[in-house]
Amino acid sequence: DVHSSDNAHKQHDVNHLLDKIYEPIKDEKLHNTAHTFNPVADTSIYGDDGAAAKTLMQKLNDHRLLEEHHWFSLFNTRQREELAMLFTVLNQCKEWDFLNNNAAFFRERMNEGEFVYALYVSVIHSKLGDGIVLPPLYQITPHMFTNSEVIDKAYSAKMTHKEGTFNMSFTGTQKNREQRVAYFGQDIGMNIHHVTWHMDFPFWWDDSYGYHLDRKGELFFWVHHQLTARFDAERFSNWMDPVDELHWDDIIHEGFAPHASYKYGGEFPTRPDNTHFKNVDGVARVRDMEITENRIRDAIAHGYITATDGHTIDIRQPNGIELLGDIIESSMYSSNPHYPGSLHNTAHGMLGRQGDPHGKFNMPPGVMEHFETATRDPSFFRLHKYMDNIFKEHTDSFPPYTHEDLEFPGVSVDNIAIEGHLTTFFDQFKYSLVNAVDSGENVEDVEIYANVHRLNHEEFTYDIEVRNHNEEDKFATVRIFLCPTEDNNGITLNLDEARWLCLELDKFWTKLGDGKNLIERSSKDSSVTVPDMPSFESLKKQADEAVNGGHDLDLSAYERSCGIPDRMLLPKSKPQGMEFNLYVAVTDGDKDTDGSHGDHDHHGTHAQCGIHGELYPDHRPLGYPLERRIPDDRVFDGVSNIKHALVKIVHDPELRA
């Protein structure tokens, strides 16, 4: 008999906990557990002797929790507290069965959105969740990813019992310039990357939950910087200028009509073009946002921040950007949560509520108040360009790297070549909408799918020739960036202008033997990207087969869904092609890491998502060596371990199956 805590049984449990989340549990065993288990009957099953479970049960019995069949937003303080309470209960469970029993119990009694978020964060962070692949959120809460028109057709198909696949278009029309890049912000894989990163690094995380999230503040900067740089690369690919930053004293130029509805709560609010920022009741005044920004800029200019107890902390040192990231977000890691104020989180609330700032029309939260939907709104990228420029102000205060800072003595990059074609195209992708529609008892499910177009690229391989003149093996870090060569007007960019627009393509470690080394690296092995997640149907089928067959299940290749979709590694480019500089920097791996030459594959997406419960593997600043200003390109040209090659990316306009 296979133990109930093996991967197959755990995957089976999670599948059934998340299936048709707005309806009672279908699995008979879990359904019985939900109605017979008492979370506080035996408190020895928890690491905290049931303190969290008692608190949550008290709130539940006093009817002080958010009702079921109601919208949930992480930016709503009270709802976030409830989610954190449930997460704490699950996180304190000593064994999988206890976590599973609690999850079944609270699934039937708490708000569905709070439950899903808490379960996802628990599986991601708890050791008990190792080996489990969380189903793609676009199949669990499809309303957050799917246009209303498609959801309506899915309901119609269900009611008439007719199978159907419905094409989902990007919201808007060609009259709207922003429509040209809607495929980026509205890509369901990019939405998943964004929401999952914020589950991997929650702004409400406290180390009392079990461990420290290493370099969380710096990763907050780097992940959003890369999203913004990638968005700008897509704009260049569509004859558009880079996105402009948001200004609190200016209008919000682009409106947005989400064409999406909550499962319960009505339509997502719309925002017309050229809206003036308004004070938002219960969130902030416009003046508060300007004050917060000024306080942060003052800290950068002074080179220090003031902690809660009044002492000053120097930010003009290597981990300064880490401290700044925690303050700008702001997270529980902030050195002073009350001063200067929460710029990022409050800004999301401000933008989300501009359609109904005083609550006159009882509108639900806007798309900016959910990490799942935020990147759909063009104002998301304006907001992050604005914050990115604040971070740049900080990094520009550091002295540029010198020849000695950059060199890897005795190592030279002799040649960079690409095997294969750098070709992008759009393909089609189907996902099931079975969980979007309601089911009665004994009513058969109907095969209903949404069909979306997604950016993709042909696979390619980097061939990098590196010579090691040291007459002994060397451990090396290989860093690969893609940098634009010119702006939208065809004006050539120097390296200092281009560096902030560069896309991180890969970062990995390798051993250099004495003499000539040929490093071959496939695009699909990038530490920046993740493959497509298995569909919910596939996860259910594999888990059921493993449980029934009594064998285990290994889905470790898909365990993390934080990372840029691997098909979006390259920017779209144009049919006539666009030239980019491919930069390869080979740096001293012994200096870059803790020096242990063990497994440095790190399985997947460590570049932008780190490694759970461990130190970030690279000691260098994120973005090194391009994160500091470069007043003279010749410093880079003068070191042998950094080289660049001109490459051309071509877009094939033919839609592929």
Curated annotation (Swiss-Prot):
Effect of P24D: Depending on subunit
Pfam families attached to this UniProt entry: Hemocyanin_C, Hemocyanin_M, Hemocyanin_N
Disulfide bonds: C483-C502, C562-C609
Lipoprotein in keyword set: no
Keywords on record: Copper, Disulfide bond, Glycoprotein, Metal-binding, Oxygen transport, Secreted, Transport
Cellular location(s): Secreted, Extracellular space
Keyword Transmembrane helix on entry: no
Effect of K26E: Depending on subunit
GO cellular component: extracellular region
Impact after mutating A84E: Depending on subunit
PROSITE patterns: HEMOCYANIN_2, TYROSINASE_2
Result for mutant: Q174K: Depending on subunit
Binding sites annotated in the UniProt record for Cu cation B: H344, H348, H384
UniProt-listed PANTHER family: FAT-BODY PROTEIN 1-RELATED, LARVAL STORAGE PROTEIN/PHENOLOXIDASE
Subunit and partners: It consists of at least four very similar subunits.
Protein name (Swiss-Prot/TrEMBL): Hemocyanin
